[in-house]
Amino acid sequence: MSRSRITLLRTHCHECAYVSGRTARLEFLSPTLRLNDHRYQLLLEQGFRRSGPYVYRPHCPGCKACQSLRIPVARFRPRRRHRRCQRANANLHVTACPPVMTQEHLALYRRYIDHRHPRSSMANPDHAEAEGFLAAPWCTTVFYELRTEAQGSLLAVAVTDVLPDALSAVYTFYAPEAEHRGLGNLAVLWQLSEARRLGAQHLYLGYWIADAPAMAYKASFRPHEIFDGRGWRAQE
């Protein structure tokens, strides 16, 4: 899928949600373009990402702080902090579920958004808004549920796209009272193990900004690769 064969549209400039004082702008694919898992994986390789059915990448004037980050699955080696996280959560069970927002999912998602983004446009979503943000009709998506025991309390959901040769972490939401368990990191570790089981080459973690504390955890998974607009650079 070459750039000459796709139509890119651009949003208006708006205030950046991650870097204070910066202006943000996105370019996105025309909604008329027919997508599937294979085509979307090619777009991920070029620095794109999806939000619901919309595929976009940053195109900000005078700023390239947002960089796509992916982990080469076969080369990943957990650090001490990752092993501690796994041991602390050894009692959790993971179940793969279809990308359908149940009432239980929605209640957890709302609590998470209210805790992490109380004044954002994401606050208090209804069912259609939540499911529309997390899933896409043309993409194979799995909701990985993390529970305290089989059929026990739902602590987290790791929304993941399962592609021909890669996994992409779409969004993870979890119980605010369980934040100390490091469930975001645990979700990535699970996605890596699942990618290894499926024989996938990469796990895509979305965009990373070096100066954004909320994104610092992504760079702790090493080695990883950063897309610089022309190719992927290894970061050991």
Swiss-Prot record:
Q: What is its EC number?
A: 2.3.2.29
Q: What class of enzyme is it?
A: transferase
InterPro entries tied to this protein: Acyl_CoA_acyltransferase (IPR016181), Asp_Glu_LeuTrfase (IPR017138), N-end_Aminoacyl_Trfase (IPR030700), N-end_Aminoacyl_Trfase_C (IPR007472), N-end_Aminoacyl_Trfase_N (IPR007471)
Chemical reaction(s) catalysed = N-terminal L-glutamyl-[protein] + L-leucyl-tRNA(Leu) = N-terminal L-leucyl-L-glutamyl-[protein] + tRNA(Leu) + H(+); N-terminal L-aspartyl-[protein] + L-leucyl-tRNA(Leu) = N-terminal L-leucyl-L-aspartyl-[protein] + tRNA(Leu) + H(+)
Cite the Pfam families for this sequence.
ATE_C, ATE_N
Compartment list: Cytoplasm
Annotated GO molecular function terms are: arginyl-tRNA--protein transferase activity; leucyl-tRNA--protein transferase activity
Protein origin, superkingdom: Bacteria
What does the entry list under GO cellular component? cytoplasm
HAMAP family in the record, alphabetically?
Answer: Bpt (MF_00689)
Q: Which PANTHER family match?
A: ARGININE-TRNA-PROTEIN TRANSFERASE 1 (PTHR21367), ARGINYL-TRNA--PROTEIN TRANSFERASE 1 (PTHR21367:SF1)
Biological function: Functions in the N-end rule pathway of protein degradation where it conjugates Leu from its aminoacyl-tRNA to the N-termini of proteins containing an N-terminal aspartate or glutamate.
Into which family does the record put it? Answer: Belongs to the R-transferase family. Bpt subfamily.
Can you name this protein? Aspartate/glutamate leucyltransferase
The major lineage groups are: Bacteria, Pseudomonadati, Pseudomonadota, Gammaproteobacteria, Chromatiales
Task: Supply the gene name.
Answer: bpt
